[in-house]
Amino acid sequence: MAPKRSRRSNRRAGSRAAATSLVYDTCYVTLTERATTSFQRQSFPTLKGMGDRAFQVVAFTIQGVSAAPLMYNARLYNPGDTDSVHATGVQLMGTVPRTVRLTPRVGQNNWFFGNTEEAETILAIDGLVSTKGANAPSNTVIVTGCFRLAPSELQSS
């Protein structure tokens, strides 16, 4: 009686699609009330150094801390969109560090092409008016982005 052949031996080894890799990138900014801070590809050192590789936003984590309270709203954009596709809603920063996670909604997670314009906004954070005093609070914000990179074989030429 002949031994049974495994089904695995019949599969093609090279038929799989190229894998994408996840990259985490962090930037530190100062957020001021009544001001909007925008983040482009050039804001994140790793994305900036990736050349013309396309990327997709998986999630943003926003952590803020400050001596004075400040309300803010973060907005996520798709490539080519002028209107935001998702937002955190009004959040409050204070002396205790708070972390907010912002992810794209299903069906709204498109690829930013490798030749994305430097001025194209990926994320924007609005500092909202939160105090009645004359001193406008300034807050330190840590923005960590998780990006999915396209395989290098698919990069723009």
From Swiss-Prot:
Keywords: Capsid protein, Virion. GO terms for cellular component: viral capsid. InterPro entries: Satellite_virus_coat, Satellite_virus_coat_sf. GO terms for molecular function: structural molecule activity. It is found in: Virion. Transmembrane segments: none annotated. It comes from the Viruses. Pfam families: Potex_coat. SUPFAM superfamilies: Satellite viruses. This is Coat protein. The lineage of its organism: Viruses, Riboviria, Papanivirus, Panicum papanivirus 1.
